């Protein structure tokens, strides 16, 4: 490990870069600029939902990184740079939605990203405790589809408010 990465900390930074790189690279392939604003938001929400649902290890590692106050993310310019792509894409969607009268003015793309990520991330990061406490199977197909639709609806209602 030390031969290739120098330290276990650097290995961890590279794992984070790989995981964040995977989501950011795939987001850039969604062709959001080619879609109408409402459809683009649907695609972002559905992609984020499915990505988190299918990449539980990503969610776990992000949770662990937050326990450590983001110390390893701070070591990576790559993660920050690649993460700007989704913010620019959301900024473009918001601008087009405002211009067409579909979305209200004044929504910040980082706030929108936080909202989408929060809804999609929480149901995975807390799935065991939430499922047990409220006796719901968050991993059932019926519940997943219901939650995906609910999140799309909530985000779009926020944008149209």
Please state what every model-predicted region is:
Residues 1-5:
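Short hydrophobic/aromatic patch on the recognition helix
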Residues 7, 33-36, 54-57, 71, ...:
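Alpha-helical structural elements of signaling/regulatory helical domains
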Residues 10-33, 39, 43-50, 61, ...:
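Alpha-helical structural segments
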Residues 39, 78-82, 99-115:
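All-alpha amphipathic helical-bundle segments outside canonical DNA-binding/catalytic cores
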Residues 47-54, 84-100, 115-161:
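C-terminal peripheral helix-coil segments that are non-catalytic and often amphipathic
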Residues 54-74, 127-134:
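Amphipathic alpha-helical segments used for helix-helix packing
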Residues 65-69, 73, 77-93:
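Internal catalytic or translocation cores that form aromatic/hydrophobic pockets or channels
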């Amino acid at each position: 490990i030390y031969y290739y990465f120098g330290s276990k900390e650097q290995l961890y930074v590279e794992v984070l870069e790989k995981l964040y790189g995977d989501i950011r690279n795939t987001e850039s392939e969604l062709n959001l600029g080619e879609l109408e604003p409402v459809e683009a938001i649907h695609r972002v929400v559905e992609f984020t939902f499915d990505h988190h649902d299918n990449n539980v290890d990503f969610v776990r590692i992000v949770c662990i990184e937050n326990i450590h106050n983001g110390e390893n993310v701070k070591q990576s310019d790559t993660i920050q740079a690649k993460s700007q792509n989704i913010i620019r894409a959301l900024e473009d969607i918001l601008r087009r939605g405002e211009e067409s009268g579909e979305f209200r003015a004044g929504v910040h793309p980082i706030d929108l990203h936080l909202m989408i990520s929060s809804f999609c991330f929480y149901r995975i990061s807390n799935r065991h405790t939430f499922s047990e406490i409220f006796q719901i199977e968050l991993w059932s197909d019926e519940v997943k589809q219901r939650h995906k639709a609910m999140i799309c609806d909530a985000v779009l209602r926020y944008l149209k408010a």
